[in-house]
Amino acid sequence: MATSSQLLPNGNLSRNGKTKTEDGEEVEAVVGARAAGADAGVALTGRLTGHPSTSGTFMKLKTYLLALRPWSLSASLVPTLLGSALAYRSQWAEEFSLATFFLTAFTVVTVHCAGNVVNTYFDFIKGIDKQKADDRTLVDHILTKDEVVSLGAILYMAGCGGFVLLAVLSPAKMEHLALIYFGGLSSSFLYTGGIGFKYIALGDLVILILFGPISVLFAFMSQTGHLDWTTMGYAIPLALNTEAILHSNNTRDADNDRRAGIVTLAILIGRTASHVLYAMLLFAPYSLFFIFGLKYSLWFLLPLVTLPQAFQIEKRFRNEQTMHLVPRQTAKLNFFFGILYVVACCCAHQLPTFGLRRN
């Protein structure tokens, strides 16, 4: 039978899909449209050495991780920390459990990740995420639509599994926990799926409530088994700062969103008013901390150390050339700002009182 030969760039001879090395040993060449460049080199090395490469698996896991938008997770993690800290400082502190804390954090963050994935899917389906989109997961075909759907389903199932364990360990009534948890889960889906709150200018309201009062109340109740509505007052600084993340994102994407036919608060009020609103959301929490610091404890002045960074971010918001950096930088600020607030709540001799009734 006739054979075909081809001289490879390295000077080796290829016959019928086999490569002859300088030592005279023949190995199968890596072929296929997607096995090129570095991937082909890794695959060929694996065949020669007998050790399969793990780089492909690692890169896939990294891709899935990036699809979760980990930079945004401070919006759900910090309220959970705050609610847990308030539980530790409350009259029901003897109920505090580290196992409950970790399960609460896992449950809340997992649902947040699932909501991010759902957001990625529906933004792409509706033609909102295009070539200039910040989220490249589906735009650049990093993951397929089926993979994104599967990832979202797995995350929701994992969150529900965490909730079941939490319900077993928590002293709270099952119906109270379920009401808040499944309300939050539904909101994370309906933000872009189904009703699509994001697309009818209600996304800001959902985020303001969900990643503030609701998350703090859920974490507090999971630990203590009690409803304390004063915890919602403590959530106000975090809720405002978290809304600043979303508003900066929507302001940056306003032109693209308008072309896609959706309506956000940033589109309704325009660029100038959006800048004013962003500044209010960014700096109002610092005013609250200043008041708390003077009236209750100097510990509440601790988050003010992040104020210079807030001014830098606000300056970038006003510049079209640096506007694209603002959402992630605001999220980073939210994390450090929130952690310092939690530390203040843990260390302060006296906590603020909001005059609300406890149950």
From Swiss-Prot:
Pathway: Quinol/quinone metabolism; menaquinone biosynthesis. One of its GO terms (biological process) is negative regulation of hemocyte proliferation. Residues 1-16 have a biased composition (Polar residues). InterPro entries: UbiA_prenyltransferase (IPR000537), UbiA_sf (IPR044878), UBIAD1 (IPR026046). Residues 1-23 are annotated as: Disordered. Keywords: Membrane, Menaquinone biosynthesis, Mitochondrion, Prenyltransferase, Transferase, Transmembrane, Transmembrane helix. CDD domains: PT_UbiA_UBIAD1. It comes from the Eukaryota. Its main location: mitochondrion. It is found in: Mitochondrion membrane. It is a multi-pass membrane protein. One of its GO terms (cellular component) is mitochondrial membrane. The chain crosses the membrane at residues 67-89, 98-118, 148-168, 177-197, 200-220, 262-284, 289-311, 335-355. Its EC number is 2.5.1.-. GO terms for molecular function: prenyltransferase activity. Prenyltransferase that mediates the formation of menaquinone-4 (MK-4), a vitamin K2 isoform, thereby acting as a mitochondrial electron carrier. Mediates the conversion of phylloquinone (PK) into MK-4, probably by cleaving the side chain of phylloquinone (PK) to release 2-methyl-1,4-naphthoquinone (menadione; K3) and then prenylating it with geranylgeranyl pyrophosphate (GGPP) to form MK-4. MK-4 acts as a membrane electron carrier downstream of a electron transport chain complex, improving mitochondrial oxygen consumption. Belongs to the UbiA prenyltransferase family. This is UbiA prenyltransferase domain-containing protein 1 homolog. The lineage of its organism: Eukaryota, Metazoa, Ecdysozoa, Arthropoda, Hexapoda.
